[in-house]
Amino acid sequence: MASSSADLHDILDRTTQGTVAVVSPVVNGPQILDMRKVVRTVPVAPHVQEYVVKLTLATHPENRENLLASKYIRYGSSPRGAQTMILGGKVRALLDGRFNVSLEDIRALMLPALRHRIILNFEAQADGRTPDDLLDEIAGKLGTN
């Protein structure tokens, strides 16, 4: 049994806190800014950008071409979702040693970029639909053209 406030603080500190990690910088601020500039120079082919545009707009419920979105989605992705897929695709391409964004990069980033950017309606919840399965289905209908 702890005999004093100091003893109790010592016990709590030793048993409820992790070890203090030693963190040392790997890159500095100017290097990060340079990396951001490099990422933005990676080209995106017109057909890849068009796919991102179609995918983003296909999440909008007012899009009459996509009955899935109008049935289950209350709010679709904003332009930020498209920006995230493009910039993420550029980073992914560089990390893979490529100098251009592929449709595969966009498909790999689609769920992390868009799942939290679409709001489902009550019908989707009642039917057990999730953002991930709806996005996969929407992307499947778009194909990769």
Feature-to-residue mapping (PLM):
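C-terminal engagement/docking regions of AAA+ P-loop ATPases
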Residues: P61-N145
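Conserved C-terminal "switch" segment of AAA+ ATPases
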Residues: M1-A69, L95-F99, L103, A124, ...
